[in-house]
Amino acid sequence: MGQQKQRNRRWVLASRPHGAPVPENFRLEEDDVATPGEGQVLLRTVYLSLDPYMRGRMSDEPSYSPPVDIGGVMVGGTVSRVVESNHPDYQSGDWVLGYSGWQDYDISSGDDLVKLGDHPQNPSWSLGVLGMPGFTAYMGLLDIGQPKEGETLVVAAATGPVGATVGQIGKLKGCRVVGVAGGAEKCRHATEVLGFDVCLDHHADDFAEQLAKACPKGIDIYYENVGGKVFDAVLPLLNTSARIPVCGLVSSYNATELPPGPDRLPLLMATVLKKRIRLQGFIIAQDYGHRIHEFQREMGQWVKEDKIHYREEITDGLENAPQTFIGLLKGKNFGKVVIRVAGDD
């Protein structure tokens, strides 16, 4: 009797969401694990990163990256172990960073893999503070924001993996850091653990008034990854020559139409002109991929010296990926969201 083949579970895009994603937009499929060919490796996913950008990849509107095809495996960064290798640079047991997506196993040519060393202490951190979110925080703040000692930095989504890192780098550079988060618990974490000077709950009815009070000298840098009413409150407080790095607009990812209310574009453009504001969007891989080693060197040192604190929210089981992702887009997460797909033995 032949040995039973291993099975590969994968979440595919069943339909494109209209508004917020729902469980029916995803479908769990299963088939035999493929065998690697010449020059290929078979990977077993250990950790899967869930990130807001994935919502954009579920839509077929023009964007900086192609959409996931209907029936295609959902995209996502992964930390995996090599199970079988026909590639000279990899051997069984190697830890690698890649983009296998929402599935148990994947076949790779090795071209898109990064080795993590034989015994990485916290392998999942390569999906967070030492990976794409940390890199996004680092380059957006330091290259576009260009913080100077004594300036006021406002950070949206202050306890998320990007915002938390932005705020802590801002403190290292001597800024007064004002965080914005959803709820008292997250705000306490921002001030007591991350070292923010102030953190405000954007759910408060008088949020705009609280922000003005927290920024008596105005705002020099606003790190934007949310949009919506937070930006509305920030706009009148911006100082001359303020900088606004834009890495995301989570509040509008599920929008199907423009929000009701007055047209804010004329005020925005007038403010940008009169105050000579630098407002710049960026895509981390395309714009700063060539500086990844600079980031890894400096961030790795900061983490080693305990100058950067990092919080993960790990959910066990690939089967829980869709519901966890839906919760992420609703702001239910607290820290970097990771799915533990398999044990790391």
Curated annotation (Swiss-Prot):
Optimum temperature is 35 degrees Celsius. The enzyme is most stable from 10 to 50 degrees Celsius. InterPro entries: ADH-like_C, ADH_N_2, GroES-like_sf, MDR_fam, NAD(P)-bd_dom_sf, PKS_ER. GO terms for molecular function: curcumin reductase (NADP+) activity. Catalyzes the metal-independent reduction of curcumin to dihydrocurcumin (DHC) as an intermediate product, followed by further reduction to tetrahydrocurcumin (THC) as an end product. It also acts on 3-octene-2-one, 3-hepten-2-one, resveratrol, and trans-2-octenal. Inhibited by thiol-specific reagents (p-chloromercuribenzoate and 5,5'-dithio-bis-2-nitrobenzoate). It comes from the Bacteria. The gene is curA. Residues 1-24 are annotated as: Disordered. Belongs to the NADP-dependent oxidoreductase L4BD family. NADP(+) binds at residues 186, 225, 333. This is NADPH-dependent curcumin reductase. Transmembrane segments: none annotated. It catalyses: tetrahydrocurcumin + 2 NADP(+) = curcumin + 2 NADPH + 2 H(+); tetrahydrocurcumin + NADP(+) = dihydrocurcumin + NADPH + H(+); dihydrocurcumin + NADP(+) = curcumin + NADPH + H(+).
